[in-house]
From Swiss-Prot:
Gene3D superfamilies (UniProt xref): Urease, gamma-like subunit
Protein's gene: ureA
Subunit structure: Heterotrimer of UreA (gamma), UreB (beta) and UreC (alpha) subunits. Three heterotrimers associate to form the active enzyme.
Name recorded for this polypeptide: Urease subunit gamma
Main location, first listed in the record: cytoplasm
UniProt lineage: Bacteria, Pseudomonadati, Pseudomonadota, Gammaproteobacteria, Pseudomonadales
Length: 100
């Protein structure tokens, strides 16, 4: 299977998000990379589903709560930026203060 570097990045991100989902299901709190992966994957999947940039910026803030991440992670994570593919091209989606 031949994958471009971008496709490899998306696959790695999806794998990290899947791991984060499993850890959440076991009741574990997520660390920084897991939180970023889960939020990023939600944005990418939302773009694939046809949502707008504005909808995805809002969706990204609903993925995780402070109770689901390790102490200090919410304060460390100010923005999550993801290049998502939309029907009209690739756009940068920025989720500000994603963990509330």
């Amino acid at each position: 299977m031949e994958l471009t570097p971008r496709e490899k990045d998306k696959l790695l991100l999806f794998t990290a998000a899947l791991l984060a989902e499993r850890r959440l299901a076991r009741g574990l709190k997520l660390n920084y990379p897991e939180a970023v992966a889960l939020i990023s994957a939600a944005v990418l999947e939302g773009a694939r589903d046809g949502r707008t940039v504005a909808e995805l910026m809002s969706l990204g803030r609903e993925v995780l709560t402070r109770e689901q991440v390790m102490p200090g992670i919410a304060e460390m994570l100010h923005d999550v930026q993801v290049e998502a593919t939309f029907p009209d091209g690739t756009k940068l989606v920025t989720v500000h203060d994603p963990i509330v």
